[in-house]
Amino acid sequence: MTVTPSETTDVDVIIIGAGFSGLGAAHRITERNPGTSYVVLERREQIGGTWDLFRYPGVRSDSSIFTLCFPWEPWTGPERVADGDHIREYLNATAHKYGIDQHIRFNTHVRSADWNSSDDTWTVTADQDGTEKTYRGRFLFFGSGYYNYDEGYTPDFPGLNEFDGSIVHPQHWPEDLDYQGKKIVVIGSGATAVTLIPALADSGAGHVTMLQRSPTYIGALPDVAITRFLRSSRLVVRPMLRIRYSRAY
């Protein structure tokens, strides 16, 4: 691919990634340091990071959404464990509400980041739609996560190439995959498997088998009615705790 060079864009802060970390950093920068300029470089076409990448059946948060979401933009949905679609909607709405989306450069693949001690600046080189983009800033924030977006981890099982069926990694779930009535084996019992397997079973899979190496504890999903009660109770409990704390100290 031919890359066309371009001029350098100077900002105070360069943020890599438009997922939870990148959006959170962008908000805190403007909240605590008004007037600070920044740019968010996102390789994908959408906001969300991992939550835009993972599209397998049943994808959802594997922890309480109240701890996953931003403290400055509380979650208002009824569920305590949110599905991937609602999380993406939340991230997009939040970025738009606070104007963060205006600072995001999509389809921008960072190729290098170099520190210059002579002027204390970072120079980031990226490809954006066939054009080389250069960004220079005093601070560089990596919100790029720890996944290999190009290829999910796949163990080298002997005989895998002799298997005649479909081999699918949840990280790159085909939109047109037809598993209706099929026998499916899921290797692993982590968060992905726990969310994937019930969704497969409920949406037409013939039989689903999970292969598990190490036993894990699994609890039932929180009930929506209980979640609403706890949320309303939290408004009462927290002030009481503050009063007791202030009186004790």
Range-by-range predicted roles:
Residues 48-90, 215-249:
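Glycine-rich active-site loop/strand segments that organize a redox cofactor
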Residues 1-5, 29, 58, 101, ...:
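Short, flexible, glycine/charge-rich loop motifs used to bind or transfer phosphoryl groups or to couple energy/partner
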Residues 2-26, 43-75, 94:
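Conserved N-terminal glycine/acidic-rich loop preference
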Residues 61, 134-135, 161:
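Extracellular/periplasmic catalytic domains that process cell-envelope and extracellular macromolecules
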